[in-house]
Amino acid sequence: GGCINHGQPCDGDKNDCQCCRDNGYCNCDGIFGLKWNCKC
């Protein structure tokens, strides 16, 4: 368990986004609804 730290990869799902410690969301590159390179 545990939360994902700032700068670590995440999958962009709600649980990951709520669990990012420092900024509270996942930032993803993406287009047409596809996401990649997601980081907290």
Curated annotation (Swiss-Prot):
InterPro entries: Toxin_34. It is found in: Secreted. Expressed by the venom gland. Disulfide bonds join 3-20, 10-26, 19-40, 28-38. Pfam families: Toxin_34. One of its GO terms (molecular function) is toxin activity. The keyword Secreted applies. One of its GO terms (cellular component) is extracellular region. Keywords: Disulfide bond, Knottin, Secreted. It comes from the Eukaryota. Not toxic to mice by intracerebroventricular injection. Belongs to the neurotoxin 04 (omega-agtx) family. 03 (type II/III omega-agtx) subfamily. The presence of a 'disulfide through disulfide knot' structurally defines this protein as a knottin. This is U4-ctenitoxin-Co1c. It comes from Ctenus ornatus (Brazilian spider).
